[in-house]
């Protein structure tokens, strides 16, 4: 089986693939202080819960693919693969890795690995032109051309960051649960804040995507818009531009990149 690991700033998502099918997944907090040994213990606990894997770390795993937006965690995971997974092929998404997607930006090495991986999956699953909206710590919008090229995108503050900022900077406001309110017009402070988050982000998505689509294609209706990320369901029902919801888009992209690189190892 293939173990895929997507390390974000807030959460780390792990997926287990049997061929092209994802058969198990986990979401844990990202902690840059964890050592390779601590990560190995954590992985062993998660892997041990799956009936098709053995008790020892690495049993049943024949490949690993990792992308990370936190360099220190990527370093420790590299140590995990070296020390605990022995001869299991491991592909870490970093400069030099073959993705199959040309990166047509001013500074390609500055583009986050997760954003490139999302583009890889979008091209494979839906073709171009496409826009991927990833609701993570930041909300990112990434554009793929009709020729399958990554051409850039937009980075905006994420939902959780915005909620925390309201609670910290607003003297009479507090941190709230991110939930859909009863109506757009809030009847109390909490509902008013929830409305601002849910409908504000839905409006942001619609506005940004519409502008990007006009730049991306002669006919904006030709652009496929894919939503992913842990908080995507909060906006899905309120946005008018999202065509597809694929919660495991990044993990699928990691599987594709692994397959394109493992033969070179």
Curated annotation (Swiss-Prot):
Superkingdom to which the source organism belongs: Bacteria
One MF annotation (Gene Ontology) recorded for this entry: metal ion binding
UniProt binding sites for ATP: 6-13, 137
Active-site residue list: 114
Keywords: ATP-binding, Coenzyme A biosynthesis, Cytoplasm, Kinase, Metal-binding, Nucleotide-binding, Potassium, Transferase
Cofactors (names): NH4(+); K(+)
The EC number(s) this enzyme carries: 2.7.1.33
Pathway connected to this protein: Cofactor biosynthesis; coenzyme A biosynthesis; CoA from (R)-pantothenate: step 1/5
Reaction catalysis annotation: (R)-pantothenate + ATP = (R)-4'-phosphopantothenate + ADP + H(+)
Tagged with keyword Coiled coil: no
Location in the cell: Cytoplasm
Cofactor note: A monovalent cation. Ammonium or potassium.
Family affiliation: Belongs to the type III pantothenate kinase family.
Record text on subunit structure and interactions: Homodimer.
NCBIfam families for the chain: baf (TIGR00671), PRK13318.1-3 (NF009845), PRK13321.1 (NF009855)
Function noted in UniProt: Catalyzes the phosphorylation of pantothenate (Pan), the first step in CoA biosynthesis.
Protein name: Type III pantothenate kinase
Native species: Streptomyces coelicolor (strain ATCC BAA-471 / A3(2) / M145)
